[in-house]
């Protein structure tokens, strides 16, 4: 639990550093949409329904190239503190297809 709280605190601080001017999506939006996923992303198990609701909401909001790139940057920052395989598989577990892998090696600038 302490790890999850520490991770979430670091992620929220990153929100203010990474925000992009062109994108309507902020890292704060990403963080609030995916906060129900923290337990799953750190320990695994069953994906909670509120987590999938957040994944679907975020996917629906990322409709422009700047929004998708910003969401990628936010997810990439968050992926550093969670289990990488759980993070990359989360969209599929929620029935969502995204056009890029969630990985610290993804080049978010190439996302269209």
Curated annotation (Swiss-Prot):
It holds the Pfam family Tryp_alpha_amyl. One of its GO terms (biological process) is response to abscisic acid. GO terms for molecular function: lipid binding. The keyword Phosphoprotein does not apply. InterPro entries: Bifun_inhib/LTP/seed_sf, Bifunc_inhib/LTP/seed_store, Plant_nsLTP. It comes from the Eukaryota. CDD domains: nsLTP1. Keywords: Disulfide bond, Lipid-binding, Signal, Transport. Gene3D superfamilies: Plant lipid-transfer and hydrophobic proteins. Residues 1-23 form the signal peptide. PROSITE patterns: PLANT_LTP. Disulfide bonds join 27-74, 37-51, 52-94, 72-108. Belongs to the plant LTP family. Plant non-specific lipid-transfer proteins transfer phospholipids as well as galactolipids across membranes. May play a role in wax or cutin deposition in the cell walls of expanding epidermal cells and certain secretory tissues. This is Non-specific lipid-transfer protein 4.
